[in-house]
Amino acid sequence: MLTAEEKAAVTGFWGKVKVDEVGAEALGRLLVVYPWTQRFFEHFGDLSSADAVMNNAKVKAHGKKVLBSFSNGMKHLDDLKGTFAQLSELHCDKLHVBPZBFRXXXXXXXXXXXXHHGSEFTPVLQAZFQKVVAGVANALAHRYH
């Protein structure tokens, strides 16, 4: 999946990420850009507009929770399927999340990382990061296969 150099680059970058800020923005973007994903979060209150979503305290808190899990995955890049096995089971068997939504969440995480880290999030780093988020998305969708 990743070379040793790529692992070092993405884990070094990830160490600088403020998961609360980037997580809030990433989940908010997911819910705004892909509005059908809001069906899983109706209990979060007002999701009626982009502004409402991006300022929703429950969205922000859950975004942090999502990226905390992602951070755990960054520590286990060689065993993403094992690391995300329980979350895969939850999202497949109980929540019935469309596996494509994981890819959409990965795109929102990359956009939020670029928005928060600007020129540091180079195209090369983005390509390396994309390998990780694709691996996480595949691990989360593993239960569907």
UniProtKB/Swiss-Prot annotation:
One cellular component GO annotation, for this chain's record?
A: blood microparticle
Give me the residues that bind heme b, please.
Answer: 62, 91
In this UniProt entry, the residues modified to Phosphothreonine are 11
Query: Which BP terms from GO are recorded?
Result: hydrogen peroxide catabolic process
Give all N6-acetyllysine modified positions: 58, 81
Give the top-rank taxon of the lineage listed in the UniProt record for this protein: Eukaryota
Tissue specificity annotation: Red blood cells.
Q: Which residues carry this modification: S-nitrosocysteine?
A: 92
Sequence ranges assigned to domain Globin in this UniProt record: 1-145
What Gene Ontology terms describe what this protein does at the molecular function level? Answer: haptoglobin binding; heme binding; hemoglobin alpha binding; metal ion binding; organic acid binding; oxygen binding; oxygen carrier activity; peroxidase activity
Keywords for this entry?
Acetylation, Heme, Iron, Metal-binding, Oxygen transport, Phosphoprotein, S-nitrosylation, Transport
Further comment: This beta chain is termed the B allele, even though it more closely resembles the sheep A allele.
Q: What interactions and quaternary structure are annotated?
A: Heterotetramer of two alpha chains and two beta chains.
Family the UniProt entry places it in: Belongs to the globin family.
Name the UniProt record assigns to this protein: Hemoglobin subunit beta
- What is the gene name? HBB
